[in-house]
């Protein structure tokens, strides 16, 4: 049976377990029923056997019970003893309770008899406890001033204000108001309130301008040793600490203290592409940056707090709702500190006074910061100059100039091998010095300086936005100028504007002052007088004056921002409380705000209006950053700010000045006597200007000026359209001047008239030699077509005989000018084409589009085509001129007799004249055009010389053997002159002149031998040329009367 499994059966009686297992479990049931067993025995056939079985089972159970009793005998005895002892203890407790009841009854009777005396003693003890509590409070209050001073010294301002407010409340309690000894404490607390206010205000002022211990920058702006005046350092600083996010507006679930911006996720930084628009901005590379990683302490150590860690300046404060909100906030460290300082001012009821003093100190502080930045920049520059004996000549200007422009400005500083100084050309025609040119040191220095200053201003304005939003929110919640739980005599008008509650301090005021100071600095850099630059501000003021006033000024967003200069600064409305504090001396520590000038001239190599190009991009980036920081309701504040002033200044002052200056430079460049005077000090052509490519000085100057103007366009993309139009105007004027020089050289000359003929122009375009021309159309021409074209051109030129000398360009200087003009025009065309591909594309061209829709302005590519076409015309004139010169000299072969008496030792005089002219002109043109172009100019001589010599036979009356030798000697002289020209196709020249010698040597053959040669080489010469061989009179040769008919018969087969 399973119920007996746990019984203590000895190991020598294991059979008991087996016997127990045979017993039915029904015998061990809790509600045992014996009736079924009795009925079973009574009805059994063998009752004795069943009874015997039951007895055996009963014996087994008895034996098991004996074993159990034997095993648990000691335990049973101990349980009986314990039970007996428990009964005894209960009995004793009953007796003692009875005695206690008796004693209590007696005590009750005794106390009832002394009730009055007990009441008196209780009242006395309560009074004494209250007196002791008051004494403790008085003792504690007496220590409050020293405690507050200690907290102030430790910069635990929030804890100090908590102690101050708590102590003030205690002093107003009924029991302490009449204590005379506390009057001194009250007086000390009143003084400490003022001292605490000024300490908080000093610290707030320091952190507003990033001079405090918890500022957002790694070091103070006055720690000059850490400043690196490079564009890279400025960019890195901007990336590490620049906020680009719009602030959240209110705290979810407004708390009693009105904590602003303490929810998780506030003050987050947006990506850079929300705040960059240079080049189509940039500047151009956006990186997501977490502002919380940039908060570093002034000593350079990492001051970023761990999440939900209590800031150190609140370590001694009593926990409350504000502290809990700060602890849970994910805002940067400096933002939390600014929130704490504003909360302290609200608890003191000094917001209006603080706002008034901050407004009073804002302009002189910004002025001082800008001056200190300039001085630090100057000192760092001087240190870097002294450290390097020779500074790097390349300046990281930040002006990413268009492709190819760096080459032009490098040329302006180098002297090429031809002895012509491009720097001198640049200085002679450019209205600006190399320092002031795009990419110059002055431009780079101005951009670097302004980048550094505006970056500092942006960081300062970030703090002002934080403070301004906090004050605006708190002003909308409760009276921020009444100390919390502290009676005051100040009675503020609930209908007053929010700016009056903050002492005139709003987000618009620091933005106005900051941009005004920056504008004044820019005017100093540009040397712009206030009269020249304040017209825009006056127009803005008039525009705002026309606007209808808002009925509800508290809720309406500010519609615009107007500022001019320091002397037209906005008026600050200072409350009485703030004015009193200023008179008390806090404002006296500020430097004189009326100081003019920043000392930027000591840093910049040069100042002037052209620095507006390097200023434009930093101002554009500054405006983007400011816009991204402003809350939505203040987004209109930047519409009439610094960027508008800069753009208006560029549009109204810089662009007109630039156009007049560069137009004058262009005029000087193309009108000077040396502008179109070919000059070269090398005998061979070089392909680069640095190595001596002799570009005409006028065109080289125009190219430099065009690149310079487009450099300004790259620096100011918004005005690229106007600047490109300037370049087009200059190029058009220069092209007209080039065409005038070209016409002066070719006017009324036969070569100029011939290239203008449609048939000749078409044939020249199909000529294989034209493949090297800049404006070739690239038509594929077969060899047979090329030969046919050359022959046809030659026939046309020969048909012009006799050619007069007046129809030719006899002045070699004019031909050299055409060669130099062609190369220079091609150089400028290539440069214009590169510039046209890199000109910045302006997204919108608001001005002039409506007028130019019908006829869109020409682009730079069309000017490049015009320049290249004129360069091609120059080369065509030179080629045709040399061919006409050849025809002019060789036309003396006609109508004469070549009956010489002796062997020819020298060529004819006209051939000597031709070859010397070829040599002289080739040497004159060699420095000005490439070898390929020289091959084009002189390559047509051999072909037309060969054709002219062969055709001259038809007009000869007679010729003998020595005459043939004279003509062969002439061809050898021409061949030698042509072979002396580098890059000339000598094989073609030899083939052409060999053909002449072969042709004339046929005259030495007998008639029958000549017919046999013609029969074998009928395609070598034309039938007319073969016929001329028979027509000419050759002394000693027998020619039958039917010679022509026999020739025709041979050629007809």
Curated annotation (Swiss-Prot):
Residues 255-308 are annotated as: Disordered. The keyword Secreted applies. Disulfide bonds: none annotated. GO terms for cellular component: cytoskeleton; cytosol; exocyst; extracellular exosome; phragmoplast; plasma membrane; plasmodesma. It is found in: Cytoplasm, Cytosol; Cytoplasm, Cytoskeleton, Phragmoplast; Secreted, Cell wall; Secreted, Extracellular exosome. Residues 91-121 form a coiled coil. It holds the Pfam family Sec8_N. This is Exocyst complex component SEC8. It comes from Arabidopsis thaliana (Mouse-ear cress).
């Amino acid at each position: 049976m399973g119920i007996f499994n746990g019984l203590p059966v000895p190991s020598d009686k294991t059979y008991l377990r087996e016997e127990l297992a045979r017993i039915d479990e029904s015998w061990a049931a809790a509600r045992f029923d014996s009736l079924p067993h009795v009925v079973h025995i009574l009805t059994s056939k063998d009752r004795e056997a069943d009874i015997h079985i039951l007895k055996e089972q009963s014996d087994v159970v008895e034996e098991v019970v004996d074993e159990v009793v034997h095993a648990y005998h000691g335990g049973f005895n101990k349980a009986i003893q314990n039970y007996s002892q428990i009964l005894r203890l209960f009995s004793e407790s009953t007796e003692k309770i009875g005695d206690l009841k008796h004693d209590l009854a007696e005590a009750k009777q005794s106390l009832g008899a002394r009730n009055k005396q007990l009441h008196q003693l209780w009242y006395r003890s309560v009074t004494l406890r209250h007196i002791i509590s008051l004494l403790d409070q008085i003792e504690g209050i007496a220590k409050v001033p020293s405690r507050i001073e200690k907290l102030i010294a430790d910069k635990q301002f929030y804890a100090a204000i908590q102690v101050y407010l708590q102590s003030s409340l205690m002093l107003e309690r009924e029991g302490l108001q009449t204590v005379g000894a506390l009057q001194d404490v009250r007086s000390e607390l009143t003084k400490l309130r003022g001292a605490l206010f000024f300490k908080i205000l000093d610290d707030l002022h320091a952190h507003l301008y990033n001079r405090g211990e918890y500022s957002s920058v790694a070091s103070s702006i006055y720690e000059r040793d850490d400043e690196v005046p490079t564009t890279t350092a400025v960019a890195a600083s901007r990336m590490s600490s620049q906020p680009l996010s719009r602030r959240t507006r209110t705290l979810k679930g407004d708390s009693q203290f009105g904590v602003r911006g303490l929810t998780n996720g506030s003050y987050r930084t947006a990506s850079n592409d929300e705040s960059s628009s240079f080049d189509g901005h940039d500047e151009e590379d956006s990186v997501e940056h977490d502002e919380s990683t940039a908060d570093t302490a002034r000593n350079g150590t990492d001051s970023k707090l761990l999440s939900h860690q209590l800031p150190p300046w609140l370590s001694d404060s009593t926990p409350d709702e504000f502290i809990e909100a700060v602890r849970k906030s994910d805002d940067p460290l400096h933002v939390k500190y600014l929130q704490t300082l504003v909360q302290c001012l609200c608890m003191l009821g000094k917001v209006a006074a603080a706002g008034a003093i901050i407004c009073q100190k804002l302009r002189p502080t910004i002025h001082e910061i800008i001056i200190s930045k300039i001085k630090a920049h100057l000192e760092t520059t001087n240190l870097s100059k002294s450290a390097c004996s020779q500074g790097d000549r390349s300046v990281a200007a930040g002006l990413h100039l268009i492709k190819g422009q760096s080459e032009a400005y490098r040329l302006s500083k180098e002297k090429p091998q031809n002895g012509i100084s491009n720097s001198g050309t640049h200085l002679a025609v450019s209205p600006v010095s190399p320092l002031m040119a795009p990419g110059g040191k002055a431009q780079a220095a101005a951009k670097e300086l302004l980048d550094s200053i505006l970056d500092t201003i942006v960081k300062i304005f970030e703090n002002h936005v934080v403070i301004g939003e906090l004050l605006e929110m708190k002003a909308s919640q409760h009276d921020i100028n009444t100390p919390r739980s502290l009676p005051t005599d100040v009675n503020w008008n609930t209908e007053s504007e929010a700016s009056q509650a903050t002492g005139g301090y709003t987000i618009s005021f620091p933005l106005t002052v900051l941009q005004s100071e920056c504008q004044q600095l820019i005017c100093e850099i540009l040397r712009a007088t206030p009269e020249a630059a304040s017209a825009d501000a006056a127009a803005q003021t008039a525009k705002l004056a026309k606007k209808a006033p808002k009925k509800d000024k508290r809720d309406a967003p500010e519609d615009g921002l107007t500022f001019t200069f320091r002397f037209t600064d906005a008026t600050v409305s200072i409350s009485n409380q703030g004015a009193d504090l200023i008179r008390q001396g806090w404002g006296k520590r500020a430097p004189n705000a009326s100081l003019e000038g920043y000392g930027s001239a000591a840093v910049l190599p040069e100042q002037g209006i052209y620095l507006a190009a390097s200023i434009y991009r930093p101002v554009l980036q500054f405006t983007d950053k400011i816009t991204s920081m402003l809350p939505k309701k203040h987004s209109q504040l930047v519409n009439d700010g610094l960027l508008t002033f800069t753009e208006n200044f560029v549009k109204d002052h810089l662009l007109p000045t630039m156009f007049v200056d560069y137009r004058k430079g262009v005029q000087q460049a193309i009108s000077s006597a040396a502008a179109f005077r070919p000059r070269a000090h090398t005998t061979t052509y070089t392909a680069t200007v640095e190595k001596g490519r002799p570009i005409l000085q006028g065109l080289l100057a125009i190219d430099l000026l065009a690149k310079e103007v487009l450099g300004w366009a790259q620096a100011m993309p918004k005005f690229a359209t106007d600047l490109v139009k300037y370049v087009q105007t200059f190029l058009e004027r220069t092209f007209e001047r080039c065409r005038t020089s070209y016409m002066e050289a070719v006017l009324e000359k036969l070569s100029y008239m011939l290239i203008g003929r449609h048939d000749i122009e078409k044939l020249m375009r199909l000529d294989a030699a034209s493949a090297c021309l800049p404006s070739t159309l690239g038509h594929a021409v077969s060899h047979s077509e090329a030969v046919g074209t050359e022959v046809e051109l030659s026939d046309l030129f020969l048909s012009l005989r006799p050619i007069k000398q007046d129809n030719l360009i006899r002045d070699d200087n004019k031909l050299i000018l055409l060669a130099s003009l062609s190369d220079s025009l091609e150089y400028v065309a290539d440069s214009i084409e590169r510039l046209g591909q890199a000109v910045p594309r302006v997204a919108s061209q608001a001005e002039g589009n409506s007028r130019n829709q019908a006829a869109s302005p020409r682009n730079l590519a069309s000017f490049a085509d015009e320049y290249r076409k004129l360069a091609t015309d120059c080369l065509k004139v030179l080629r045709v001129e040399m061919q006409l010169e050849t025809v002019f000299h060789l036309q003396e072969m006609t109508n004469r007799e070549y009956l010489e008496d002796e062997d020819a030792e020298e060529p004819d005089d006209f051939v000597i004249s031709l070859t010397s002219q070829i040599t002289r002109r080739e040497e004159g043109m060699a420095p000005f055009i490439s070898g390929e172009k020289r091959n084009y100019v002189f390559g047509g001589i051999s072909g037309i010389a060969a054709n002219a010599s062969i055709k001259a036979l038809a007009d000869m009356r007679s010729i003998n053997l020595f005459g043939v030798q004279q003509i062969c000697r002439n061809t050898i002289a021409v061949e030698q002159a042509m072979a002396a020209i580098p890059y000339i196709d000598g094989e073609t020249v030899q083939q052409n002149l060999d053909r002449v010698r072969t042709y004339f040597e046929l005259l030495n053959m007998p008639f029958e031998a000549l017919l046999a040669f013609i029969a074998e080489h009928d395609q070598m010469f034309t039938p007319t040329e073969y016929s001329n061989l028979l027509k000419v009179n050759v002394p000693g040769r027998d020619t039958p009367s039917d010679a022509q008919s026999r020739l025709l018969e041979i050629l007809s087969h």
